[in-house]
């Protein structure tokens, strides 16, 4: 005889318990006589019922019957089908779980009934399995983090050693750039001085040959030059009195007239020298 048949009362019909009378009588269940009737809740089928101590089962059955005040029946299909059909009642798993939790806590330091025993939390083992499966992944992640931290610390220790050569390379590059800039400036200065040196003789030659872009200095007008040329043809050397007269006639100073006659004599001397050389070369056949 199984433990299920020990605490099941087959003589009672499906009705309210005598310990908790109700004003209105509940009609008996309209099931066939060959069905085994139960006075309390049966959570498991007969072959699936756990073979544990009957004391815990009775306490749990009394607790559920006292808290709910109603019963329900389970119908087995004559053994041909293993399924069970619970009759609609006021049974709630949350209420039974709460009352059972209170009962075990008030009685003493007895351990709480396992949820898997009463079928309240069937998915709990899967959760535990997922946690156990996730713990190796967490451990591997922590190991990777520790290895990464050690690697970064080693790199940080090695960085000061590499920092010195890098700083030296940067200094060398900056020095090379500075030296190249200095050389470029020196070359520019040399080129500027060279152009200045070449331009000075060019300007001097242009000034001598009167080929420069600057206009020649011409302080005398045409009328003044003509009057001075006429006087020079008559007399190459002027007295002080004559010089004063000419200066008044052409509206020039005494000094200007004096300088003009000096320059004109030098020009005449140069022309006579060139003419003499030309005559000599033509006579002696120098080519």
Curated annotation (Swiss-Prot):
SUPFAM superfamilies: Homeodomain-like. One of its GO terms (molecular function) is RNA polymerase II cis-regulatory region sequence-specific DNA binding. Residues 213-272 bind DNA. One of its GO terms (cellular component) is nucleus. PROSITE patterns: HOMEOBOX_1, HOMEOBOX_2. It is found in: Nucleus. Residues 93-109, 149-158 have a biased composition (Polar residues). It comes from the Eukaryota. InterPro entries: HD (IPR001356), HD_metazoa (IPR020479), Homeobox_CS (IPR017970), Homeodomain-like_sf (IPR009057), HXA10/ABDB-like (IPR046333). CDD domains: homeodomain. The keyword Cell membrane does not apply. Keywords: Developmental protein, DNA-binding, Homeobox, Nucleus, Transcription, Transcription regulation. It holds the Pfam family Homeodomain. Residues 70-210 are annotated as: Disordered. Belongs to the Abd-B homeobox family. Sequence-specific transcription factor which is part of a developmental regulatory system that provides cells with specific positional identities on the anterior-posterior axis. This is Homeobox protein Hox-A10a.
């Amino acid at each position: 005889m199984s433990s299920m048949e020990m605490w099941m009362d087959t003589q009672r019909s499906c009705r309210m318990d005598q310990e908790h009378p109700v004003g209105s009588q509940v009609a008996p269940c309209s099931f066939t006589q060959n069905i085994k009737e139960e006075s309390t809740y049966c959570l498991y089928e007969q072959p699936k019922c756990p073979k544990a101590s009957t004391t815990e089962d009775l306490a749990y059955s009394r607790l559920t019957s006292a808290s709910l005040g109603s019963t329900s029946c389970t119908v087995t299909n004559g053994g041909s089908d293993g399924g069970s059909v619970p009759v609609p009642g006021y049974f709630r798993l949350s209420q039974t779980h709460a009352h059972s939790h209170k009962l075990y806590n008030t009685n003493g330091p007895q351990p709480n009934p396992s949820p898997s025993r009463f079928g309240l939390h069937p998915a709990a083992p899967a959760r535990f399995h997922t946690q156990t499966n996730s713990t190796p992944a967490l451990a591997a992640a922590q190991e990777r983090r520790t290895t990464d931290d050690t690697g970064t610390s080693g790199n940080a220790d090695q960085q000061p050693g590499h920092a010195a050569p890098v700083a030296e390379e940067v200094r060398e590059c900056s020095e090379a750039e500075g030296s190249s800039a200095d050389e470029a400036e020196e070359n520019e200065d040399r080129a500027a001085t060279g152009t200045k040196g070449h331009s000075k003789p060019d300007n001097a030659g242009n000034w001598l040959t009167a080929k420069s872009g600057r206009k020649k200095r011409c302080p005398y007008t045409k009328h003044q030059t003509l009057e001075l040329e006429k006087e020079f043809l008559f007399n190459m050397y002027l007295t002080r009195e004559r010089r004063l007269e000419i200066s008044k006639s052409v509206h020039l100073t005494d000094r200007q007239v004096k300088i003009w006659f000096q320059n004109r004599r030098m020009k005449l001397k140069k022309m006579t020298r060139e003419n003499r050389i030309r005559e000599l070369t033509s006579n002696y056949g120098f080519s």
